[in-house]
Amino acid sequence: MTKLALFGAGGKMGVRLTRNLVNSDFDVLYVEVSEAGRQRAKEAHGVDCVTPDEAIVEAEVVVLAVPDTAIGAVAKDIVPKLKPGTMVVCLDAAAPFANHLPERADITYFVTHPCHPPIFNDEATPEGRADHFGGIAAQQGVVNALMQGPEEHYDLGEKVAKCIYAPVARSYRVTVEQMAYLEPGLSETVCASLLVVMREAMDEVIKTGVSYDCARDFLLGHMNILGAVIFDEVKGGKFSDACNKAIEFGKPMLMRDDWKKVFDFEEIKASIIRIT
């Protein structure tokens, strides 16, 4: 049984991951340095936390469930103490992409991140439909990157990913650089920004006297069908001539001509530096 150490077990993400790890095939050591975090882990899942040094001695896999801004400092402290061949799992590409992980050739760096449950799904239970983040009851995809280490370590890293993010429907292998284009590039810089604009647009309509419920119902319903057509969920789906004309005139008013520069490598790099 693989010995896995979860660092940050009492934090927001650590508590999420523990939900799946407590019933897994891994022999888990829960690591939390703060007393409040230790108490939170105990109350949430009944687990007792150990010190970092206790975990490092035995760990074959180390999962860093700590904020992006803290990964560099945490990794700098623990990586030199790990046994050769140990796998270090990061839950986001930001810190690895920004070179915040210590150089050490005899350990493995594996990066994994959830896609989160998709808008279009076939969840059959109330729990699944309510699990917007994933890791509880809704199926989701995961993306993984073997940043460094022997090729045979990929399967172990993917096993960890499928456990902590379960239930997992699909698993995708990418590079760390490609993962950075997915997040923050695609998911945050583009998607989150445009969703904020959509919410602001809804608020503008509400100012005209349309009720909140009406505007929200109208917008989310149209997001459903428009999204189904745009993202190939409806085979052969097409917009009306009026809708296409609205897009033709609306998009230039909303988007700069050079907006795709957000995917330039230097822009992605700058975005990651800002958040780490």
Give the residues covered by each predicted segment.
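Rossmann-fold dinucleotide-binding core
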Residues: 91-183
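Rossmann-fold NAD(P) dinucleotide-binding segment
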Residues: 52, 56-100
